[in-house]
Amino acid sequence: TYAALAHPSTIAHLKKIGVTSVELLPIHQLISEPHLIKMGLYNYWGYNTINYFAPHHRYASLQAQSDGPQAIMDELKTAIRELHRAGIEVILDVVYNHTAEGGARGLTYSYRGLDSSNYYRQDDAGNYHDTTGCGNSLNFGNSHVVDLVIDSLRYWTNEMQIDGYRFDLATTLARDESNTFDPGHPLLRRIVEDESLSSAKMIAEPWDVGLGGWQ
C-alpha cells in the first residue's frame, strides 16, 4: 500500500541498503484486461491506465479506500513526503502511450468515449494504428493529446511532488502525424522547456512495436 511504502520500517530498510531513489511501477488509475477478469485474475503490473491524474485506489490501505478519493490522495502524498524526508527520491513509471480501452473491439472506459478520433491514432478508415501492442496508441500528432500529458506531468510534479518519470514505450510519444518518430517532437520540446518539468529526471524506454520503433 501507499502507507506501507512510507512505513518507518520500510524507510529504515531502504536507508540501510543505500537506496536514494525508488521507482514505482504505474500507479495511475488502471483496470485489468477483460480476459484476465474472466479468469479471476488481476493486472498486477499496472500498464493498463484509464486516467492519468488519479492514483490507483487498490494500492491504498483499506481504511483510505473506505474514506474515499481524498484519503487515497492524502495517503500517497504522505508516503512521498516521508520518503523525501529520508532523502529518497520518487520516480514514477508512466504509461502515456496507450489506454486500457484496447483495440477497436475493446470497451469504452475513458478517452475513447470522450473523443476516439482525436485521442487515438487512426487511419482514414478509422482503424487504429497500434504501435504499442496493446490495441491502441494515443495520437501525439494532436496538440490536445500533448497538452493532456504535459498537464498530467505538471500535476504529478507540482501537486504530488514526484521527482522524475520513466516513460513506457517512449517512441510512441514522439511519433508525428505520419506515424514517424520525430526527435524534435513538440511533446519532447515542451517537456524540456517547461519550467516545472525541465529539472525532473526523465527515463525513456527507447522503443515501441511500430516501424523504426527502436530509438
What is the role of each PLM region?
Residues 188-192, 199-215:
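Polar, glycine-rich mid-to-C-terminal structural blocks
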Residues 88, 197-200:
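A short helix->loop->beta-strand "cap" motif at the edges of active sites that frequently abuts
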Residues 2-161, 166-193:
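Substrate-binding/active-site clefts of carbohydrate-active enzymes
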